[in-house]
Amino acid sequence: MLPAALHPDSLWRPLEQLVLPPIIRDWMADPDSLTRRLKRYGHFSVVPGLHAIALPRADERRLLSLPVRRAALIREVTLHLDDTPVVAARSVLPLTSLAGANRSLGHMGSRSLGLELYNRPICQRDQVWARLASTDQHHSLCWGRQSRFIKRGAPLLVAEYFLPALWEKLHVARCVQASWLHDKAYLYASIRGEPTDAVRLSRF
């Protein structure tokens, strides 16, 4: 399952407005294929989860300019390194975006959607948005990013959550964990509607 947002008011915010630890920003702001990058660190695999025609969430609908009752293909997967889940991903593909040469995007199975997006013709990518999410009942935190892609003129939305196991794999887990107290301060300021530009997340 994808991480659940800690609070419905913990909204997506433009990535460039956030002060993040360098290692997290490096991954969140990387414009290239996440799949290709992950493959450098071990055996990569995609484990499919939800794959259904359903109504997008309100924030997803707004970013895709979809009518309120317009369904889309929702796909949720986890990306694994050496059989360990390191990224949870959710894609929202309007049915009108799955026509013609884009039809294969709706039948990815255990293949990486990211690799397909970066195959020719290479997709266009809009602004990157970010937010915090919880990963389990203990409220372990992770950062997620969301981007809108345009493939052959058709829009789709991809959200990726970087799970704690990724930082363990990169041997930087201790540094990332040290930043969570500051990250929580940012999140709770967001929930309360307080200014977040004064909440500086830790650096390392």
Curated annotation (Swiss-Prot):
Its EC number is 4.1.3.40. Pfam families: Chor_lyase. GO terms for cellular component: cytosol. Substrate binds at R75, L113, E160. Pathway: Cofactor biosynthesis; ubiquinone biosynthesis. It is found in: Cytoplasm. It comes from the Bacteria. One of its GO terms (molecular function) is chorismate lyase activity. It is an enzyme of class 4 (lyase). InterPro entries: Chorismate--pyruvate_lyase (IPR007440), Chorismate_lyase_/UTRA_dom_sf (IPR028978). One of its GO terms (biological process) is pyruvate biosynthetic process. Keywords: Cytoplasm, Lyase, Pyruvate, Ubiquinone biosynthesis. It catalyses: chorismate = 4-hydroxybenzoate + pyruvate. Belongs to the UbiC family. Removes the pyruvyl group from chorismate, with concomitant aromatization of the ring, to provide 4-hydroxybenzoate (4HB) for the ubiquinone pathway. This is Probable chorismate pyruvate-lyase. It comes from Alcanivorax borkumensis (strain ATCC 700651 / DSM 11573 / NCIMB 13689 / SK2).
